[in-house]
Amino acid sequence: MPENTVIRVEDLSFAYGNIPVLEDVSFSIKREDFVCIVGPNGGGKTTLLRLILGLLQPDRGSIRVLSQPPEAARRRVGYMPQRAELDSQFPMRACDVVLMGRLRNTKLGPFRRADRNTVAAALDEVGMADLAKRSFSALSGGQRQRVLIARALACEPEILLLDEPTANLDPLVQDEMNDLLNRLNERLTVILVSHDVGFVAQYVKTVVCVNRTVAVHTAESVTGDSIRELYGHDVRLVQHRHSH
């Protein structure tokens, strides 16, 4: 695999039972790319992320992540799922949530000072250092998303995978989140799933269109025709940048 390629997918197919989800998928992602995965509901976007993480195994074809099988590279990938399996009412501080991201990097026993230093740095990077001791349940939706991104950063990844990180956020908060992801992309490969088609050309470099098969475009080349072909109908391309 070329040195600047961090993910390579070749001739991949996957089905849940007899229901095909992905067929004959081949593409690659370069280091420090900013990638948005788009497509209709049920098109295979989240399944593709799970295959990249090694949580699912392809029926045919291969995936290499950082020149390794996905399950071997998982420690080098930070992941924020679409729905965090956290009870927002559980009495846990923001820093405790982020500390969970150190579990796979830490031997059995109490967390070390180095772990807590890494957590503090991750919270600072996402702009949440001042709220580190605040209860997770007391945070706003956007603040919780930042904490969950910090949790993904706490494992010191080379690739950041995010499933719908701006879902259900107000437009201004979405803009702030997108600016954060842009800054993270200065040192990390960032791959996210988004239903916000207007987000695509505004922030990202590469668009991976998923609807059973996969087509890869530069962000500048995404047009109404390509999106219509992907979704099967017209989709409004709305920009969310606001002035305040």
Can you say where each PLM-predicted feature lies in the sequence?
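Conserved beta-strand-loop-alpha-helix hinge in the C-terminal portion
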Residues: 210-237
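Helix-to-loop junction immediately C-terminal to a conserved catalytic motif
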Residues: 53
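Catalytic Walker B motif of ABC-type/P-loop ATPase nucleotide-binding domains
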Residues: 160-164
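Conserved ABC ATPase "signature" region
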Residues: 99, 113-131
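Conserved ABC transporter NBD signature motif
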Residues: 61-75
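Helical segment within the ABC ATPase nucleotide-binding domain
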Residues: 174-186
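Conserved ABC ATPase signature
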Residues: 135-139, 143
